[in-house]
Design a protein with these regions (language model features):
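Actinobacteria-biased recognition of intrinsically disordered, low-complexity terminal regions
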Residues: 1-28, 214-215, 225-228, 408-410
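An amphipathic alpha-helix adjacent to DNA-recognition modules
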Residues: 27-35, 47-48, 68-92, 111, ...
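Helix-turn-helix
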Residues: 32, 36, 40-78, 245-276, ...
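Hydrophobic alpha-helical connector segments
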Residues: 93-119, 295-322
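Amphipathic alpha-helical segments used for helix-helix packing
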Residues: 117-140, 318-338, 375-379, 386
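Amphipathic alpha-helical packing segments from all-alpha helical-bundle domains
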Residues: 136-161, 170-171, 338-362, 371-372
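Hydrophobic/aromatic-rich alpha-helical bundle segments in the mid-to-C-terminal region
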Residues: 139, 160-203, 210-223, 344, ...
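Conserved small-residue-rich
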Residues: 181, 221-290, 378, 382-385
Length: 410
């Protein structure tokens, strides 16, 4: 028995009181709270997290947490605007680089933006997908910060490529920001320096893309769903509402009304509830992506050809179902847990198949690196879509080119 053990035993026998543990408040408590809340919000969504959840994760009481922040919203708002501000500072060009060559200036801005994104990866998730739950004035501030980032990128891209029209510069900058912040859409891991190198290379390839003329795409008209196909009509209307207002802000009653049903109870003849509708939508999106891989590979002459086919199919499918594409990125945390496991496996396998093709084309990259690039390519569709909607500047043909630049390299 050790000396320490003997002392402990004596105290137990004699009844000597144990020394009181003094817990001191860490000097960086607010930073700890910010990091913990960002991880929680990023994983479960703003509506899926309570102050009690955050306090428990920190090992403190709710009362202690409320001494730092008066509400969950205050915590959420401060963290999003903090990172938005950090991103705007990152793209500010130092005075000593004002006369540097255009490429050097762009590389500096990219390096700083990528570093800031990596450092704040969990909160960047919130900036990308949960910012819509900010109050209008706060959302305007966040959007203003993001526009500042895009303008700063635009200044450097325009200097590098003065022949580009202003709209085309904006397209390339949206694509660059999308590729950089796409690391917030997944949990794949790589060393920081590797991520920096990979994203810098992808962003540089995007900046060099020769965009075709902006021509409106002839998208197929939405298929009319007969009233007798209520299960399909419910699914479409639910996705449209989730896209417009966010899953937590949509009720079963509203879905029923949109689908022309007389009462919410009628929905339950087709689906067990709102979460079942969301899960069905996610399965459809996941199956569309995973089901395309095998036929594309079988019909192609090589991996590059298969990748070209998959890019075209992915973009066409996403443009045909814009609302579903957005919902797939924003509402995953609201899918029932058992469905999330299945969907994660489907998505992981789909990404692995794409990544394998990319590695065939670019054997100098590791499997982990190609997975990062696949996620960056996927992000182009949703980010160009929400930035330009039906504007020809963000046409399917252009999105395909941007995806190719990321996956095939410059």
């Amino acid at each position: 028995m050790s000396v320490d053990n003997r002392r402990s035993t004596r105290k137990a026998v004699t009844g000597d009181p144990a020394p009181r543990e003094i817990r001191r408040r860490p000097k960086n408590r607010r930073a700890q709270i910010a990091a913990t809340s960002a991880a929680a919000f990023g994983s479960l969504g703003y509506h899926g997290v309570s102050m009690e959840d955050i306090a428990t994760a920190l090992g403190i009481s709710s009362a202690a947490l409320y001494r730092h922040y008066p509400s969950k919203y205050a915590l959420f708002q401060e963290e999003l605007l903090r990172v938005g501000s950090a991103m705007t500072e990152a793209v500010r060009l130092p005075a000593d680089l004002a006369d540097a060559p255009p490429r050097a200036r762009l590389e500096h801005v990219l390096e700083a933006l990528i570093s800031t994104t990596i450092e704040n990866r969990p909160t960047v998730t919130l900036v990308r997908w949960e910012g819509r739950y900010l109050a209008p004035d706060d959302l305007a501030l966040l959007n203003g910060q993001q526009m500042t980032v895009l303008r700063a990128l635009g200044t450097q891209v325009a200097a590098l490529r003065p022949e580009l029209a202003e709209t085309d510069v904006r397209v390339l900058c949206v694509a660059i920001l999308s590729a950089v912040t796409s690391i917030a859409d997944h949990h794949a891991a790589l060393p920081v320096k590797t991520i920096q190198r990979l994203l810098t290379s992808a962003a540089t390839a995007i900046a060099a893309v020769e965009l075709p003329p902006a021509v409106a795409a002839e998208l197929p008209a939405p298929v009319e769903i007969p009233d007798s196909f209520k299960h399909e009509l419910l699914l479409r209307k639910a996705v449209e509402l989730f896209h417009a207002r966010g899953y937590p802000n949509v009720s079963v009653e509203e879905i029923a009304t949109a689908a022309g049903l007389s009462a919410a109870s009628a929905v339950y003849r087709f689906y067990r509830g709102k979460s079942d509708l969301l899960a069905a939508a996610f399965r459809r999106a996941a199956d569309r992506v995973s089901g395309a891989v095998g036929p594309a590979v079988a019909a192609s002459t090589d991996s590059a050809d298969a990748l070209e086919t998959l890019i075209r199919q992915y973009v066409a499918g996403s443009f045909a179902e814009r609302a579903l594409t957005f919902v797939y990125y924003t509402e995953f945390q609201h899918v029932p847990a058992e469905e999330r496991t299945v969907l994660r496996n489907i998505q992981r396998l789909s990404v692995e198949e794409w990544a394998r093709l990319v590695r065939d084309v670019r054997p100098e990259l590791s499997s982990a690196e190609t997975r990062f690039l696949v996620h960056a390519a996927f992000a182009q569709v949703v980010d160009l879509g929400r930035a330009f909607d039906t504007d020809p500047a963000g046409s399917p043909e252009r999105v395909c080119l941007l995806m190719r630049a990321i996956l095939f390299g410059s």
